[in-house]
Amino acid sequence: MSTMRLLTLALLFSCSVARAACDPKIVNIGAVLSTRKHEQMFREAVNQANKRHGSWKIQLNATSVTHKPNAIQMALSVCEDLISSQVYAILVSHPPTPNDHFTPTPVSYTAGFYRIPVLGLTTRMSIYSDKSIHLSFLRTVPPYSHQSSVWFEMMRVYSWNHIILLVSDDHEGRAAQKRLETLLEERESKAEKVLQFDPGTKNVTALLMEAKELEARVIILSASEDDAATVYRAAAMLNMTGSGYVWLVGEREISGNALRYAPDGILGLQLINGKNESAHISDAVGVVAQAVHELLEKENITDPPRGCVGNTNIWKTGPLFKRVLMSSKYADGVTGRVEFNEDGDRKFANYSIMNLQNRKLVQVGIYNGTHVIPNDRKIIWPGGETEKPRGYQMSTRLKIVTIHQEPFVYVKPTLSDGTCKEEFTVNGDPVKKVICTGPNDTSPGSPRHTVPQCCYGFCIDLLIKLARTMNFTYEVHLVADGKFGTQERVNNSNKKEWNGMMGELLSGQADMIVAPLTINNERAQYIEFSKPFKYQGLTILVKKEIPRSTLDSFMQPFQSTLWLLVGLSVHVVAVMLYLLDRFSPFGRFKVNSEEEEEDALTLSSAMWFSWGVLLNSGIGEGAPRSFSARILGMVWAGFAMIIVASYTANLAAFLVLDRPEERITGINDPRLRNPSDKFIYATVKQSSVDIYFRRQVELSTMYRHMEKHNYESAAEAIQAVRDNKLHAFIWDSAVLEFEASQKCDLVTTGELFFRSGFGIGMRKDSPWKQNVSLSILKSHENGFMEDLDKTWVRYQECDSRSNAPATLTFENMAGVFMLVAGGIVAGIFLIFIEIAYKRHKDARRKQMQLAFAAVNVWRKNLQDRKSGRAEPDPKKKATFRAITSTLASSFKRRRSSKDTSTGGGRGALQNQKDTVLPRRAIEREEGQLQLCSRHRES
């Protein structure tokens, strides 16, 4: 006991010595409250905070005033009663008068000027979130615009994708619109229509009539009480509060005068403890107390200003204290967890979801700060319905956009009477055509006039089928700019917008795209695709290289070197056969001794044998006789068989099964991967193919080359290939294969790449997307898509490439006929040479015979004279005279021919040793004839 007394005395002594060190720091907290009762609650909350924190270093002190009737008095009261007391923060509630919305404003302006934090208790106007106006304002309640988060969550829970946003054109309405649109963008969606009206307007009928024409049946309303009442009255007159409609509103729209006219079934929101000023006082004091203790632990803390004295009295620590307050997390609040966002607004607020039933508000769910938890069994929807409305009406008149792309969509002009010409398909069925409006010319720079035209093809048949199945009508128009759709910058800014069919769909000019629109990720981020109605990929179109048959086509199976070797082999083998048979002792033989020996194999016969074996023409005579030569003959026959068989096989490959050589092998062809100006290839500008090449890093080199040569449309590019202005065109395989089957000078080459499909495009919130996909799947199952494919895509006018033998034409075999003609000409030429040679040889033989006959007669006469006969026989003398006369005249003709042929020099006979007798022989014969003549005369 004595020890305790000593400690107490020591403590009292130390405090008396250093009193300042023992006294707690007084922290004043100001408040502007609605009533004296709330001032008492404020003081009690401060005392509770002192007890809760239990720190002897800090003592919170409450300083409060009530609301003043006008803004000037309120500002003066803040300066004289609160700031003069060096308050660290000021709490302010909403004034009790409903129409006085701006009472917190003078408090916020005055305290904010000196950087003193202000905590709003029940103020929910969105203007206080603007920190350029209210620098130091925080609040323990969320603004009205935060109700958009609850609406957005309810849309997600009930799968409502079609909404109409009806807002007043004031700060509150614009804030709600901005927040909801931001949330919808994160979900890649948007409101079907945003309708604004001026605050205080008394007539919104025209606006609601516009809303009634839309598909959406979920209406979100943000307006004041009086404006909401005006909207409710007009909606009831237009029958927009009955079955099928959904009304989502906030707290103001089901309060006061608005509740009197609100339709049964409406769903509204009420902030839990939103008007419980005492609860918010307790939570605000707790947040400030927690922040003060955290602030005073820091260094260089200055005291708040003492009074409103110019701009030199700004609290330097005020911004720091505000940041400490905004980062506070007060978990044990009466109204729940208290936290602030970057604008100083309350986060994680809890709402009650209220349903108006029989003119009474019934709670049918809650929002716990992150999720909506509804009680669907308790909800009564407009019109007394108990089933959740689907939130949209199915429009029976759809705007269809398409594009000219054969064979999917053909476009032809109408007849003079505005109708379409009757045509028939390959199956004999009439072609189904629809009237479509669109520009008569989509080429760049040309004047465009929207005119009615006739559309038909694969996609039109599909559209007619879908309309019949899903019970809707349609109006078709061609895309204005002739493009499928890609994103492009607007006025060289960073903002991008879609053009083509994509742009028309997203802007609301069309409800559906029925065209060969390629499904890709970039487009799927903005629109909804149906299941593919046609699977395909990308391929390459080139001009077909038609082979030109030359006269030497029959020689193509062998190279020139091989032909030379075969020809050389024929003659070498012939010479070897001749030599072997010549030198063999068995080259000539006879069957028995009585027969004469057979002739040996001559060089001519050997040559004939060699060629005959090679050409399989049969050997009638001149076969080798010796065993060695016959061995060579058999080997040569085997060689000839192999050569002929190889030639025949290759000849069939070159002439019968010949196909045009494809110019490129596919996307990995070196001419594509390593582009040059000698080989130009391209695709269509701003198409899915263009996007594909632009997005692929490994194809960047190809894209840079293609970008300079891309065409406006596929039809232009295909014609450029046919005109040899473009070497290769990369496009959808379904289109290019059809073009190749219709235009026989074109061919597709290479394997498919970038496999994808064609789908029907709809907006993200389209009510038709599920039904369209189901209808397409059923069409695949029942064979309808296969029938369309056969009718429009796979129909071929050109012969398809196959492995069946092709028919030979004269061009293929012209060289063979020329070879025969050459043989005939050579034979005729040689026969004349043979005739001339034969005549020359016969004349020479006759001359020799006459000469020998004359010599024989002379010898006979000489022998007779020697034997004693005086006179020769007169007949013999006459014969001898005739022979010598003929022989002499013959020699004279030869000599004169020789003289005329030798002109001024040596004659041709001197250069031809085998055509005339030697000069000496002629002179010797002439001498003998002269001797015979003299002897006869003697």
Swiss-Prot record:
Changing Y647S: In NDHMSD; likely pathogenic; decreased ion transmembrane transport; reduced localization to cell membrane; changed glutamate-gated calcium ion channel activity; mutant channels are activated at 50-fold lower glutamate concentrations and 28-fold lower glycine concentrations. Disulfide bonds join C79-C308, C420-C454, C436-C455, C744-C798. Residues 581-604, 616-627, 836-938 are cytoplasmic. Changing G638V: In NDHMSD; likely pathogenic; changed glutamate-gated calcium ion channel activity; mutant channels are activated at 2-fold lower glutamate and glycine concentrations; decreased sensitivity to magnesium block; reduced localization to cell membrane. NMDA glutamate receptor activity is inhbited by Mg2(+) in a voltage-dependent manner; Mg2(+)-induced blockade occurs only at negative potentials and decreases with membrane depolarization. 7-chlorokynurenate (50 uM) or Zn2(+) (100 uM) partially inhibit the NMDA glutamate receptor activity, while acide 2-amino-5-phosphonovalerique(100 uM) almost completely blocked the NMDA glutamate receptor activity. Dizocilpine (1 uM) results in long lasting and almost complete block of the NMDA glutamate receptor activity. Changing I642T: In NDHMSD; uncertain significance; changed glutamate-gated calcium ion channel activity; mutant channels are activated at 2-fold higher glutamate and glycine concentrations. The chain crosses the membrane at residues 560-580, 628-648, 812-835. Changing E662K: In NDHMSD; this mutation produces a significant increase in NMDA receptor-induced calcium currents; excessive calcium influx through NMDA receptor could lead to excitotoxic neuronal cell damage. NMDA is probably regulated by C-terminal phosphorylation of an isoform of GRIN1 by PKC. Dephosphorylated on Ser-897 probably by protein phosphatase 2A (PPP2CB). Its phosphorylated state is influenced by the formation of the NMDAR-PPP2CB complex and the NMDAR channel activity. Residues 1-18 form the signal peptide. The modification Phosphoserine is found at S889, S890, S896, S897. Heterotetramer; the NMDAR subunits are modular and harbor tiered domains that function in concert to regulate opening and closing of the cation-selective ion channel pore. Forms heterotetrameric channels composed of two GluN1/zeta subunits (GRIN1), and two identical GluN2/epsilon subunits (GRIN2A, GRIN2B, GRIN2C or GRIN2D) or GluN3 subunits (GRIN3A or GRIN3B) (in vitro). Can also form heterotetrameric channels that contain at least two GluN1 subunits and at least two different GluN2 subunits (or a combination of one GluN2 and one GluN3 subunits) (in vitro). Belongs to the glutamate-gated ion channel (TC 1.A.10.1) family. NR1/GRIN1 subfamily. This is Glutamate receptor ionotropic, NMDA 1. It comes from Homo sapiens. The gene is GRIN1.
